[in-house]
Amino acid sequence: MELIEKLQPIKKPLMVLGTSSGAGKSLTVTAIGRILKNSGEEPIPFKGQNMSNNAWVDWNGGEMAFSQALQAFACGIIPSSEMNPILLKPQGNSTSEVIHLGKSKGITTAKDYYKDWFFPGWGVIKKSLNSIYERYPNCRLIIEGAGSPVEMNLIHRDLTNLRVAKYLNANCILVTDIERGGVFAQIIGTLELMKPDERKLIKGILINRFRGDLSLFEEGKKWIENKTKIPVLGIIPWLDDKFPPEDSLDLLEKKSSLTNPELKVGIIKLPSISNFSDFDPLENEESILIKWVMESQNLNQYDFLIIPGSKQTIKDQKFLRDSGLSEDIKNYSTNKGNIFGICGGLQMLGTILEDPFFKEGSKINCEKSINGIGLLPLKTTFFQKKITRQINSESIWPQVTEINGFEIHNGVTELDNSQDTFKIKPIFKDLDLGWYKENIQGGTIAGTYIHGIFENDDWRDHYLNLIRKGKNLPLLKKRTRSYKMKRENIIDNLANEFKKNFNISSLLN
């Protein structure tokens, strides 16, 4: 299904393709964006289609992948869903929610998606590209591919790799991860499967995550260049990046080097976990060790627990119930435990979840109603309408301070008047954004709909100090660097490493 029309931007777009998923495409685009921004250019990130439950909400309430939002920050611009016009949010059982230009278009199976959604998807991608170039006529687009560009069973319906490269006549770089092994076969195999006109677009090869002495790979570099007639433009050393991973499989590979933490945080690894970027500010705290909880266990080793967001809340609550974790969490709460739920995690902390329209899944695989963990007297009902919006509010607990973040959820949560609601109190001035309850035994149970809550430095410090006080630890003092400043520093360091080890100038012509 060849589409040969082409767009002709003023500045040559760059495209980052990979030999596989996890090769380093996202970080490469992030680094290039910051390098070009610092050089005075106007870079704009773009990924035609992304599959991720790690999402962001733009200024217009549109959903987009968090990785493209992060790339926009690196480029020094405000994220917009046009930078990621198609977002697929996996729901399990080979189904995904389809997001076009930030808005949900429904749920489909993988088979039906490839059959029915190709032309609408390509139209959305072209519309987004035209819109970006109308708004930023002198920009340089930095495009990210997805997975491998040569999945031969899907290539005729691949919306986001070589089709985009040919449409824009982009200068492409092929990135491969040497740490996983098989780098020579990955490079040669990928190039051999391309058509001649596609292979001509590949202007360079980038070796990512090299450990050890770079000089030891000099012969390998020469072999690749002699075999492919394409220059190896860079060898990036292994970097201890602190960015949140793009999917939940990579999530478990993140290792902490912290050996003597002051606080130990347990995060429940839900089967349908979403928005795990919520915990990036905690990962960047020097005194906190994060552990992922995946099975029933004694939770008293943790100073506080987090129940994260979920793409399928009822299904994940069923997992907590059937695995025994729901009972473990209740037992933890009676031992001065501190528990915090975000979005779906807040819903699960309540007494009941009802899904009259089966918004949480199919009628076969999903329960219409299920009891929650029961630690907060809250009832959640899932309706047809999905709420996506940015939040600017003010907290009243644990301290009065300004709050920013965003909401992405189905479901409306309200007090369950069949329960004792006397002890539950609102966290924010906008009363429906979150609640908390202090345990008689000590500790607090709290939850919010606000994603990005821990990015709010003052709020995070006061919440952590509440826990530190209960552990007789010294309270945190007012910090000199915000989380967002740390994130900017991480992006700068990433860009500096790429600039030292990657000849980007040859791609700009």
From Swiss-Prot:
GO terms for biological process: cobalamin biosynthetic process. One of its GO terms (molecular function) is ABC-type vitamin B12 transporter activity. Catalyzes amidations at positions B, D, E, and G on adenosylcobyrinic A,C-diamide. NH(2) groups are provided by glutamine, and one molecule of ATP is hydrogenolyzed for each amidation. The keyword Mitochondrion does not apply. This is Cobyric acid synthase. InterPro entries: Class_I_gatase-like, CobQ/CobB/MinD/ParA_Nub-bd_dom, CobQ_GATase1, CobQ_synth, GATase_3, P-loop_NTPase. Keywords: Cobalamin biosynthesis, Glutamine amidotransferase.
